[in-house]
Amino acid sequence: YIHERDNWTNFRWDASEVSILREVVCRKQGLLYGRLSTLGFDSKLRAMAENLTHDVVYSSEIEGISLNEEQVRSSIARKLGIENVKYTAPSHYVDSVVGVMLEAVQNYDQPLSKEKLCAWQTAFFPTGFSEACEIEIGQYRTNEEHIVSGIFGREKIHYIAPSPDLLESEMQRFIAWFDGEDTVGSVIRSAIAHFWFVSIHPFEDGNGRLARILSDMLLARGEKSELRFYNISSQINKDKNHYYDILERMQRGDGEITEWLVWYMKKMIDALDEAETIVTTILNKSFFWQKAASVPMTERQTQMLNLFLDGYEAKITSKTWATLAKCSKDTAIRDIQDLVDKNILIEDIPGAKRPSYSIVYDAEDLTQFFTDVSIIEENGIQYLKALFKGKKTICERVLKLDAERYQKGDLPLANLLSKYCSYIAAGNRDL
């Protein structure tokens, strides 16, 4: 195994192959933070809260642990001081896990220590048990650690971690590197830290989650920001079989980790693309409420609009409204008609037998600003591509349902552009 080699942490990689992807990551980071600069502080906090919710939930899911997403979202919102969020009382465990993530990213510039790592690992296992098995918490493991799969008696060994008597020296070296000079850039350091930490495997359990938190810390240091708007955990969770396969190959290797760095940075690119979608949603939602703030609405109408503004994937119909709002269909029809009369909703196809509606983000017809509109697909994701005012090509990720409805003629172009491009038109009408 890799740790059995002399100077095993003198990792090597193909600089030309890695640098190409690193440049893509850095460019996308710059684009994301450029867009975020247009948001107010409250909107930035909401974007961060949504990202951290996904980070905490998916980082746990990678390890086979399911957390209640609404509890996580509520815990993060409360700790960040975000108001007007539907509150679901979080369990003590969820609060503890959220606390670890927030402590790490909000204090990214503080030194790492054994004590800090042990405290974080304890927070993951407050009862001292993992899957009904008692484990060592708050200290480095004192037992040999074999990473295995398969049924009892026919296990397959994937990796044997360093022996317990080596952990103190191995972790001292890791922590010194972690807090030392950055010579390769935060993106590559983030990937190396992840691989290095899980290869030491200092704790009996919780190593994967800690590795991902440490990766986020290094990215925060590189960006010099405690506000986190993208996470790699959700992308790893989508491809976790490949994740474990690459780790196993690298841990049986000789320190040449190009494959790991390439895979990791591709996941970062996916994470940044997903973050762009969240930011677009928040920008359009913010633009909508600036226009609609003075329009009188019931609490139910406001809650339902926010649900769809946040990207809930469904057509707005009286049936859907009644189901989600837990009200009668007659009440739903009255709610919707009232919003149509106030120019908050618009019927997609006037006179349709089963009418559906779209939110009016912008009262102006945006088809006058956008030409050459098409729906394209990349890696299973749909995008709206168009030319804005004959000068700038834009590409916005759209919900699969919206793409399908537009292509079938069920969703007018004006309504599609209003939903995904209002913030663009709002800030650039004088171009």
Question: Where are the regions a protein language model picked out?
Answer:
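FIC/Doc superfamily catalytic core
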Residues: 1-389, 394-400, 406, 412-420, ...
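Short, intrinsically disordered, charge-balanced linker/junction segments flanking boundaries
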Residues: 428-430
